Amino acid sequence: VITGAQKPIDLAITDARSNLLDSLRFASHDRAHGISIVFGGKVIAGTRAKKEFSKSYNAFSSINYPDIAVIHDDRIVFYIDDKEQSTKLLQFYHAMDDRIFLLKLIPSINPLVLENLADSYDGLILESFGVGGLPDYGNHDFAAMIEKWTSAGKLVTMSTQVTHEGSD
C-alpha cells in the first residue's frame, strides 16, 4: 500500500494523517492484496493510478478502472473484491532494471531516436498520442526500429498519453 499527502503532516490542516491512517487500515484488512494507492479516502489499483492534481486532496484517479474501495468514517467499502482471483504466489523483486526509457511520441519525431537509445537502454515505453498508432514518415520506419529492439532481446511496450479510454 502506497500513500502520501498533499500537505505536510505537521500542519494543522493536512491530509497526511487521514491518508496514513486509511492506508494502515486498508493494509491490515484481510481482503487487501496487490499494489494499491490509498489517498483521499480512495483505494486505487496501483496499475491504474495516475496523479492528476498537484494541490487538491483528491490528487489521484483510477484510469479506466473503478476504485477498489472507499474509506469513509473509518470503514472500508469495497467496490471490487477480487482477492480470490489472485492465484499467483507473492513474489518480491529486490533489484530492478533502471535502464528503461520512456519516450513520449510527438508529431514529427524522428524514428532514428530509437536507434540512438538502443545501446544505453534495455527496455522502452512508447507513449503514443492517440489510440496507439505509430507515426509513419516514409523513409524512417518506427516499426522497423522497434523490430531491431525486440530482435536484440529488449522489451518494448506501448501506452498512450491520453488519460481516458485507453489504447488499442
Where are the regions a protein language model picked out?
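Active-site histidine-anchored catalytic micro-motif
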Residues: 1-168
